[in-house]
């Protein structure tokens, strides 16, 4: 289904591009030269915005948050990272191949020292549009406490352990006793 949808998108993009190219009378321009009213062609926009590795300036502190005693020069580095659009809100642009790159960075310890050292950073070499991970499933990996009467239970998100909202003392105050299996206050057994 996704392949068919992508194929339709590309076919439509190609038709629009060819139709526009047929009627445009654009003169060739030198590299770096821009027309005042230049219009970027649809296919160029589409290809440049689709999910792919793209050079991104990344703050070194984002990659090394524990190295707060240093000032880095430069403070950010150019890295290839996945970015772009996937043409479907259910998909996200994610890396499928990565590698490390080592760069020389000046590390400055204020009022003490400075030196050029090597630091390793992660780069993305391949990207794909893949289904977004279900955030609700990631946030709560625990199964439900009970299929019925869920409102009677409370669940510890760390251990997934279920316990009763009712307490034994609350049940006893009503001359009842807590049934720990159902989490209800029942009449005492005789």
UniProtKB/Swiss-Prot annotation:
<dbReference type="InterPro" id="IPR029034">
    <property type="entry name" value="Cystine-knot_cytokine"/>
</dbReference>
<dbReference type="GO" id="GO:0016020">
    <property type="term" value="C:membrane"/>
</dbReference>
<dbReference type="GO" id="GO:0008201">
    <property type="term" value="F:heparin binding"/>
</dbReference>
<keyword id="KW-0037">Angiogenesis</keyword>
<feature type="disulfide bond">
    <location>
        <begin position="86"/>
        <end position="129"/>
    </location>
</feature>
<feature type="disulfide bond">
    <location>
        <begin position="51"/>
        <end position="93"/>
    </location>
</feature>
<dbReference type="GO" id="GO:0050731">
    <property type="term" value="P:positive regulation of peptidyl-tyrosine phosphorylation"/>
</dbReference>
<keyword id="KW-0497">Mitogen</keyword>
<comment type="function">
    <text>Growth factor active in angiogenesis, vasculogenesis and endothelial cell growth. Induces endothelial cell proliferation, promotes cell migration, inhibits apoptosis and induces permeabilization of blood vessels. Binds to the FLT1/VEGFR1 and KDR/VEGFR2 receptors, heparan sulfate and heparin. Binding to NRP1 receptor initiates a signaling pathway needed for motor neuron axon guidance and cell body migration, including for the caudal migration of facial motor neurons from rhombomere 4 to rhombomere 6 during embryonic development. Also binds the DEAR/FBXW7-AS1 receptor.</text>
</comment>
<keyword id="KW-0964">Secreted</keyword>
<keyword id="KW-0325">Glycoprotein</keyword>
<dbReference type="GO" id="GO:0005172">
    <property type="term" value="F:vascular endothelial growth factor receptor binding"/>
</dbReference>
<dbReference type="InterPro" id="IPR023581">
    <property type="entry name" value="PD_growth_factor_CS"/>
</dbReference>
<dbReference type="GO" id="GO:0001938">
    <property type="term" value="P:positive regulation of endothelial cell proliferation"/>
</dbReference>
<feature type="glycosylation site" description="N-linked (GlcNAc...) asparagine">
    <location>
        <position position="100"/>
    </location>
</feature>
<dbReference type="Pfam" id="PF14554">
    <property type="entry name" value="VEGF_C"/>
</dbReference>
<keyword id="KW-0732">Signal</keyword>
<dbReference type="GO" id="GO:0048010">
    <property type="term" value="P:vascular endothelial growth factor receptor signaling pathway"/>
</dbReference>
<dbReference type="GO" id="GO:0042056">
    <property type="term" value="F:chemoattractant activity"/>
</dbReference>
<dbReference type="GO" id="GO:0008083">
    <property type="term" value="F:growth factor activity"/>
</dbReference>
<dbReference type="InterPro" id="IPR027928">
    <property type="entry name" value="VEGF_C"/>
</dbReference>
<dbReference type="GO" id="GO:0051894">
    <property type="term" value="P:positive regulation of focal adhesion assembly"/>
</dbReference>
<protein>
    <recommendedName>
        <fullName>Vascular endothelial growth factor A</fullName>
    </recommendedName>
</protein>
<dbReference type="GO" id="GO:0045766">
    <property type="term" value="P:positive regulation of angiogenesis"/>
</dbReference>
<dbReference type="InterPro" id="IPR050507">
    <property type="entry name" value="PDGF/VEGF_growth_factor"/>
</dbReference>
<dbReference type="InterPro" id="IPR036841">
    <property type="entry name" value="VEGF_C_sf"/>
</dbReference>
<keyword id="KW-0217">Developmental protein</keyword>
<dbReference type="GO" id="GO:0010595">
    <property type="term" value="P:positive regulation of endothelial cell migration"/>
</dbReference>
<dbReference type="GO" id="GO:0002040">
    <property type="term" value="P:sprouting angiogenesis"/>
</dbReference>
<keyword id="KW-0339">Growth factor</keyword>
<dbReference type="GO" id="GO:0031334">
    <property type="term" value="P:positive regulation of protein-containing complex assembly"/>
</dbReference>
<dbReference type="Pfam" id="PF00341">
    <property type="entry name" value="PDGF"/>
</dbReference>
<dbReference type="GO" id="GO:0097475">
    <property type="term" value="P:motor neuron migration"/>
</dbReference>
<dbReference type="GO" id="GO:0060754">
    <property type="term" value="P:positive regulation of mast cell chemotaxis"/>
</dbReference>
<feature type="signal peptide">
    <location>
        <begin position="1"/>
        <end position="26"/>
    </location>
</feature>
<comment type="subunit">
    <text>Homodimer; disulfide-linked. Also found as heterodimer with PGF. Interacts with NRP1. Interacts with isoform 2 of BSG. Interacts with CD82; this interaction inhibits VEGFA-mediated signaling pathway.</text>
</comment>
<dbReference type="GO" id="GO:0050930">
    <property type="term" value="P:induction of positive chemotaxis"/>
</dbReference>
<dbReference type="GO" id="GO:0051781">
    <property type="term" value="P:positive regulation of cell division"/>
</dbReference>
<dbReference type="GO" id="GO:0035148">
    <property type="term" value="P:tube formation"/>
</dbReference>
<dbReference type="GO" id="GO:0001666">
    <property type="term" value="P:response to hypoxia"/>
</dbReference>
<feature type="disulfide bond">
    <location>
        <begin position="82"/>
        <end position="127"/>
    </location>
</feature>
<keyword id="KW-0221">Differentiation</keyword>
């Amino acid at each position: 289904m996704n392949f068919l949808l992508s194929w339709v998108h590309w076919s439509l993009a190609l038709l629009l591009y060819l139709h526009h190219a047929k009627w445009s009378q654009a003169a060739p321009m030198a590299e770096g030269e821009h027309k005042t009213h230049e219009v970027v062609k649809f296919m160029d926009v589409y290809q440049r915005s689709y999910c792919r590795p793209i050079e991104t300036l990344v703050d070194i502190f984002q990659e090394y948050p524990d190295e707060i005693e240093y000032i880095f020069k430069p403070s950010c580095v150019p890295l290839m990272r996945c970015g772009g659009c996937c043409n479907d809100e259910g998909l996200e642009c994610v890396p499928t191949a990565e590698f490390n790159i080592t760069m020389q960075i000046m590390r400055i310890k204020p009022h003490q020292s400075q030196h050029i050292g090597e630091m390793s950073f992660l780069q993305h070499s391949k990207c794909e549009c893949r289904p977004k991970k279900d955030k609700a499933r990631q946030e709560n990996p625990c199964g439900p406490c009970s299929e019925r009467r869920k409102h009677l239970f409370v669940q510890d998100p760390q251990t997934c352990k279920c316990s009763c909202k009712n307490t034994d003392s609350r049940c006893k105050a009503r001359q009842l006793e807590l049934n720990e299996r159902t989490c209800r206050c029942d009449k005492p057994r005789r």
